[in-house]
């Protein structure tokens, strides 16, 4: 996901057998996912990166690490926290696509595509086959207007939302878009090729402000249909944060209890509960889902590490505090009314 964000940096080892994708926050190098190499090379590339980090006095942490890195981390007695899962659709067997489930989505799609009802049409744009700057500008306008509306409507922090230019890496992308009866584009889904799983990741999948209800569902369905025709069996929906921390290792029991409590308290105040419900209606394949971890090689994470992670997750501490204060005020008001 984060490779779409140009603010990330790649560290390549001397033998050019592996790489790390990272961003520095609060003098902590936050590595996105696992090292990009075979697991047996983890020690070598991490040792090289450690020597490089010493020049700048950076710490290190991992966000979105897989179970493969988590297993290595436990062997090294590092701290690991399972904070989420990556949800994945299988376009070759998906129950909604095969019309064995999701009747509401199927009926809604047919109504939207009916020329006498919704009048919606679908288009596919693959820049690798030829660039269309006019279309790109039109689709980028959808993304910008959607993001502007989302930010205005957000009463709390928009956690785990990546902000980037969807056209920064066009040769890796396939775009699916919708047009209304007036010919104006009103929906966009961007599919990024992910080589490790020989599949795709979808982000964003959005409707323009004022678009008919169900456009994003139609785009998700269309993405599965397209990948089915391409014989692709892997479509990542992205992170789904857990309401409570999963497996935790490397923390003393008292600190683990405090960490779990703080995480649960924070999660309840973030507007991300709808992710699970949205993903579930498309019937992700549980056999393709994978656990996601935060990993801290230094052991118990310090304040700098936690602040860096909060920033990386796009969590606004100011908005969290505001939400907490509002919640406390509402509780006090309710008590006074009694």
Residue map of PLM features:
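A conserved beta-strand-loop-helix scaffold within acyl/acetyltransferase catalytic domains
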Residues: 1-30, 34, 58, 62-81, ...
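Acyl/amide activation-and-transfer machinery of modular secondary-metabolite enzymes
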Residues: 82-86
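Inter-domain linker/hinge segments that demarcate the starts of reverse transcriptase
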Residues: 41-45
């Amino acid at each position: 996901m984060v490779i779409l964000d140009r603010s990330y940096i790649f560290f390549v080892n001397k033998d050019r057998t592996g790489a790390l994708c990272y961003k520095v926050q609060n003098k902590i190098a936050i590595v996105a996912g696992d090292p990009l190499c075979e697991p047996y090379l983890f020690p070598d590339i991490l040792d090289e990166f450690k020597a490089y980090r010493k020049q700048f006095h950076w710490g290190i942490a991992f966000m979105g690490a897989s179970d493969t890195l988590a297993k290595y981390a436990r062997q090294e007695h590092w701290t690991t926290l399972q904070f989420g899962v990556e949800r994945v659709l299988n376009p070759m067997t998906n129950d909604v696509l095969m019309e064995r489930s999701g009747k509401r989505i199927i009926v809604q799609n047919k109504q939207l595509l009916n020329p006498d009802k919704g009048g919606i049409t679908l288009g596919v744009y693959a820049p690798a086959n030829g660039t269309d700057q006019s279309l790109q500008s039109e689709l980028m306008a959808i993304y910008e207007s959607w993001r502007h509306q989302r930010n205005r409507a957000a009463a709390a922090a928009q956690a785990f939302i990546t902000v980037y230019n969807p056209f920064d890496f066009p040769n890796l992308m396939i775009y699916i878009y919708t047009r209304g009866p007036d010919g104006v584009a009103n929906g966009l889904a961007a599919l990024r090729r992910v080589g490790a799983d020989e599949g795709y990741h979808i982000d964003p999948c959005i409707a323009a402000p004022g678009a008919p209800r169900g456009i994003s569902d139609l785009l998700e369905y269309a993405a599965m249909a397209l990948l089915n025709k391409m014989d692709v069996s892997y479509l990542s929906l992205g992170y789904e944060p857990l309401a409570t921390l999963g497996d935790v290792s490397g923390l003393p029991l008292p600190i683990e209890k405090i960490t779990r409590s703080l995480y649960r308290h924070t999660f309840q105040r973030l507007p991300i509960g709808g992710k699970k419900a949205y993903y579930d209606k498309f019937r992700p394949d549980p056999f393709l889902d994978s656990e996601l971890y935060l990993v801290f090689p230094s052991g118990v994470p310090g304040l700098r590490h936690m602040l860096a992670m909060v920033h990386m997750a796009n969590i606004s501490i100011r908005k969290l505090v505001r939400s907490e204060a509002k919640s406390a005020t509402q509780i006090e008001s309710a008590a006074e009314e009694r």
